[in-house]
């Protein structure tokens, strides 16, 4: 359970050639990531977000299938965190969301994300 100054969130991360780490659980050698442009990653996430918001897809199921973060095995669940624990753009986007809302595309050194605030 998140304390008053903490939030709880899940996310879907798509890494691209500009990401600080070029490997993920589903692409251990980074072969796909190295050939994915930021623009392609953003377009993929926009399409995913549309499907989730329209009800065609479930956030957690999509996160499990496509997220480049190891949190994919938990449906993208990052658990609770407070200010200063995540990269600034990620933190600001998460704190700006209401519980249940899904962010627009958020850029960090890790890649591009959509975030769902869960508490």
Swiss-Prot record:
Which PANTHER family does this chain map to?
PEPTIDYL-PROLYL CIS-TRANS ISOMERASE, PEPTIDYL-PROLYL CIS-TRANS ISOMERASE PIN1
- The gene that this protein is the product of is PIN1
Question: Can you provide one Gene Ontology molecular function annotated for this UniProt record?
Answer: peptidyl-prolyl cis-trans isomerase activity
Q: In which tissues is it expressed?
A: Expressed in roots, leaves, stems and flowers.
**EC number per UniProt:** 5.2.1.8
Its biological purpose is as follows: Prolyl cis/trans isomerase with specificity for phospho-Ser-Pro bonds.
Pfam families documented for this protein: Rotamase
Catalysed reactions, semicolon-separated: [protein]-peptidylproline (omega=180) = [protein]-peptidylproline (omega=0)
Phosphoserine-modified residues are: 103
* A GO CC annotation given for this chain: mitochondrion
GO BP: any one term? regulation of flower development
Q: Other remarks on record?
A: Like all plant Pin1-type PPIases, do not contain the N-terminal WW domain found in other eukaryotic parvulins, but contains a four-amino acid insertion next to the phospho-specific recognition site of the active site. These extra amino acids may be important for mediating the substrate interaction of plant enzymes.
**Family (UniProt):** Belongs to the PpiC/parvulin rotamase family.
Ribosomal protein recorded as keyword: no
Q: What class of enzyme is it?
A: isomerase
Please identify the protein, giving its name as recorded. Answer: Peptidyl-prolyl cis-trans isomerase Pin1
Source organism, top-level taxon: Eukaryota
Keywords (alphabetical) are: Isomerase, Phosphoprotein, Rotamase
Give start and end of each PpiC domain: 4-119
């Amino acid at each position: 359970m998140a304390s008053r100054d903490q939030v709880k969130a899940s996310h879907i991360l798509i890494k691209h050639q500009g990401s600080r780490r070029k490997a993920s659980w589903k692409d251990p050698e980074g072969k796909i990531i190295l050939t994915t442009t930021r623009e392609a990653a953003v377009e993929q996430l926009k399409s995913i977000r549309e499907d989730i918001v329209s009800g065609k897809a479930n956030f957690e199921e999509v996160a499990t299938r496509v997220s480049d973060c190891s949190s994919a095995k938990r449906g993208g669940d990052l658990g609770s965190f407070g200010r200063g624990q995540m990269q600034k753009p990620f933190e600001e986007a998460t704190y700006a969301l209401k519980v249940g809302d899904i962010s627009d595309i958020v850029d960090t050194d890790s890649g591009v994300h959509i975030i769902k605030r869960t508490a």
